[in-house]
Design a protein with these regions (language model features):
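Non-heme Fe(II)/2-oxoglutarate
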Residues: 1-73, 175
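Catalytic core of non-heme Fe(II) oxygenases with the double-stranded beta-helix
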Residues: 56, 60, 64-175
Length: 175
């Protein structure tokens, strides 16, 4: 079974609060041969725990798993704000490095053109993503995906990666 789920988990107002919190923070640009990645240097893990908690509850319910968080700390997770500006893109790649099992994202705005988020099945079929503010997606880190070129505006998302060591599969109570 391929895991690719999406659901609106955050209100437009909540997304605006998250975006405003980081809008003036310095952004590091990291480039490699295949991707362009932007991440905030100053994520406040304690203040942003409510965002992570909402993701965790959704992921646990969707996949019937338990995600372990040591000492209620979000520092065990990769947690990024990523912004793409006109001309930016994120070429086709997968995220199954550093023991990542699942990737989650939250779309914070829709004031951009282009920037389509595309996830591919193992047979290279495209799975659509709804570009609605507050929409979250969850997919297996091994699935290829990309963000097409931003034509206009800025596309901002929160990204969270869950690692294998944090996941315990729940037993089916019917068995």
């Amino acid at each position: 079974m391929i895991v690719f789920k999406q659901k609106i988990l955050f209100t437009e107002q909540e997304c605006d609060l998250i975006l405003k919190k980081y809008i003036d923070k310095p952004i590091n640009k990291i480039e490699d041969t295949d991707t362009m990645k932007y991440k905030s240097k100053d994520i406040d893990y304690n203040v942003d725990k409510w965002v992570l908690d909402r993701f965790i509850n959704w992921v646990e319910n969707e996949l019937n798993i338990k995600i372990e968080v040591s000492n209620s700390s979000t520092k065990d997770f990769e947690f990024y704000l990523q912004s793409y500006k006109a001309g930016d893109l994120f070429n086709k790649h997968n995220d199954n490095v550093y023991n990542r099992v699942y990737a989650c994202g939250l779309l914070l705005n829709n004031t951009f053109k282009g920037g389509e988020f595309i996830v591919y099945t193992p047979n290279d079929e495209m799975m659509p993503f709804n570009n609605t503010i507050g929409n979250c997606y969850l997919f297996e880190a091994s699935l290829s995906h990309e963000v097409t070129e931003i034509v206009e505006g800025t596309r901002s998302v929160v990204l969270i990666f869950f690692r294998n060591s944090q996941i315990t599969f729940k037993r089916n109570k019917l068995l």
